[in-house]
From Swiss-Prot:
Its main location: cytoplasm. This is Thiazole synthase. It holds the Pfam family ThiG. SUPFAM superfamilies: ThiG-like. Homotetramer. Forms heterodimers with either ThiH or ThiS. The keyword Transferase applies. It comes from the Bacteria. GO terms for biological process: thiamine diphosphate biosynthetic process. The gene is thiG. Keywords: Cytoplasm, Schiff base, Thiamine biosynthesis, Transferase. It is an enzyme of class 2 (transferase). 1-deoxy-D-xylulose 5-phosphate binds at G156, A182, G183, N204, T205.
Length: 256
């Protein structure tokens, strides 16, 4: 069971809504993933339409919506988008995203911290997408963010946990949930994140662009479950030396 702010989730896999070939495939994949928290970009939602092709099926699916501020380049733009989301969707939950460079989509640490502090004061439950910077994640936690979402690699790159060393520090020092976001390309990456102590992962591109998104979503669900179970089972420590699993000393002496 994962608790963030005032909500609990059975699934430790969060999903996105971008890049799917159709809204039907999006919903089928989300259901197959078992995800209960789904993020959507406010820039992709037509708030003038009650039957928006993205929003309506998500509401029907009964998932918790996590609107994001993707597209915002400054704290001011993100704060404006956050208020639009709260008014339109009736939720104070927000994935804070500020990335001024459209090529790399790397989060702006200064603007993110600035916006996070303001939004928390305004009553939002803020989950910030950020770089894998232990100092920044601690600062975001201190200003009241409900979780931190450091990247594993650039958005949509499918490179995996390129920031593993920093993620380990973030996880070790955090007192709020850590959700590894961005760069997760295959289910084994998700399993590794849970094994190393992350509370959840957010996956979008790897599922949406797969040849079979529904089955890929299932694979991610199983991988996250396996990674969590492995961590809870207490894996053995790594060693530089070999350790025999079946000592042969007694057997050899008895045969002599």
């Amino acid at each position: 069971m994962l608790r963030i702010a005032d909500k609990t989730f059975d699934s430790h896999l969060f999903t996105g809504t971008g890049k799917f070939a159709s809204s039907q495939l999006m919903v089928e994949s989300i259901r197959a993933s078992g995800s209960q928290l789904v993020t959507l970009a406010m820039k992709r939602v037509d708030l003038r339409q009650h039957n928006d092709a993205i929003l309506e099926p998500l509401i029907a699916a009964g998932v918790t919506l996590l609107p994001n501020t993707s597209g915002a380049k400054t704290a001011e733009e993100a704060i404006f988008a956050a208020h639009l989301a709260r008014e339109a969707l009736g939720t104070n939950w927000l994935k804070l995203e500020i990335h001024p460079d459209a090529r790399w989509l790397l989060p702006d640490p200064i603007e993110t911290l600035k916006a996070a502090e303001t939004l928390v004061q305004q009553g939002f439950v803020v989950l910030p997408y950020c770089g894998a910077d232990p100092v920044l994640c601690k600062r975001l936690e201190e200003v009241g963010c409900a979780a931190v979402m450091p990247l594993g690699a650039p958005i949509g790159s499918n490179q995996g946990l390129e920031t593993r060393a920093m993620l380990e520090i973030i996880i070790q020092q955090a007192t709020v949930p850590v959700v590894v976001d961005a760069g997760i390309g295959v289910p084994s990456h998700a399993a590794q994140a849970l094994e190393m102590g992350a509370d959840a992962v957010l996956v979008n591109t790897a599922i949406a662009i797969a040849d079979d998104p529904v089955n890929m979503a299932k694979a991610f669900r199983l991988a996250v479950e396996a990674g969590l179970l492995a961590r809870q089972s207490g894996p053995g420590s790594r060693s530089h030396f070999a350790h025999a699993t079946s000592p042969l000393t007694g057997f050899l002496e008895a045969s002599a």
